[in-house]
Amino acid sequence: MVAEWKDAGGPTGPPRWIAPLHLHRNDDEAWYVLEGALCVRVGNEVVEARAGTSVLVPRGTVHTYWNPGPGLVRYLLVMTSNIYSLIQDIHAMAERSPAALRAVFEKHESELADE
């Protein structure tokens, strides 16, 4: 599945992650940047992808991503139907406590990671 997303960025300072640090046990995930820049942490490495570039996160790899600046970033998220369902379930959550998030990630064969 492919979905277009965007993030308007934010104030300077520490990264404001778009997703918590996590991994997918059985699913790869990729980003293709259409406009702006997107930082993706892949394991212990940080990749800054600019318009026209992509980043692949292999299954089992801890990752997160964020807009590194105040400007707009637009990107395509290439994902399996399982990851898409995970995102939909997260957006539908009334309560996003750590325990509730962990349960949703586990349901989709994924897990939250510690820093």
Language-model segments: residues:
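Residue-level recognition of well-ordered beta-strand positions that form the cores
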Residues: 4-6, 37-39, 76-78
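Short, surface-exposed beta-strand-loop junctions and turns on beta-sheet-rich folds
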Residues: 9, 39, 46-48, 71-72
